[in-house]
Amino acid sequence: MNIAFAQTKYSTTSEDFNNFHSTVSCAERMFKNDSLLQAFGKYGTAFENYNGSINPTHYFKATLCALKIREEFKALDYLEKAIKNGYEIDSNKTSLIVFNNQNTNNEYRQNINKWTAFRDSGRNTSWENEIDALQEEGKTHSTSTFKTAVESCVNCFKNKTCNKTTPDYVSKYKLVKEKMKADSITASKLLASTKQFGFPNMKLVNKKECAIARTILLNYDCDKKNERLDDLLFKALNEGYISPSFYAQVIDRRNVMNGLTPEFYEPITGYEKTIGKDLIIANNKRKTIGLYTIILPKATAKEKPVAGAKVGTTADTNLYDY
């Protein structure tokens, strides 16, 4: 279902999709809080009961959880799914992949290179190079000067009493408009190539290029009401290429850039002290796109704590990195 009132257009996801993300995000909260057995069970439930596409990041996190409780055969299964579906293990995480059982260790060593080769065989280097070139083109408008101007203007957009006629604001807003125009050109090029190559995802391009593409789409502020991007983003969301968190960030960025209130408060950073009574409303909206609920320390809204979550910790946020 499409939502397009006065604010930014977005679409709501299916019950099946929402149930999966509710369960898997609960697992990841538990994992972050060291409730490992409960997290392991939640991961299993999430994967077994969902028929849709799953981002390999979830399989990798489930791998780490399984390894910590010595469920090594299950960890091996999750790791194979993660890598074959495009996951790249960061160098700072390779030391976490340890199989103590001789059988699982042998199987891991015999297969890791095969899984990696399978993953790499599906990569489109031409698409990767094109995304890298787009990032290079946008460097002029990615300097601290432009970033500072955007941050300053966004803070002003959030404050209804902010004076938008001061020389400082006017000069910074000119930079914002210049950046928006440049970002629009970059986004248009990315969208044109997406029709040819497919949406940038971990099966097609590596993690770095996926992140670059997401940044380009997030910065496409000329698409003020998300009317040009929503069909593409919603399809990518359902295919597991982008997370509910990223989808919400796009919607909220468009709202804020237009002086409107966020729909989902994603990210919550900066709104902790002001969301108050709107927390329940925001969480109900978040559920419609499969996004985990916000849990704030000393929240004024009466929210039922999520099992396994220590209220107010960093484990309550930043559950997605894709």
State where each predicted segment sits.
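Hydrophobic alpha-helix position signal
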Residues: 82, 99-102, 194, 236, ...
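Intrinsically disordered or highly flexible coil/loop and linker segments, enriched in small
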Residues: 199-200, 242, 295
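A cross-kingdom marker for long, charged
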Residues: 247-322
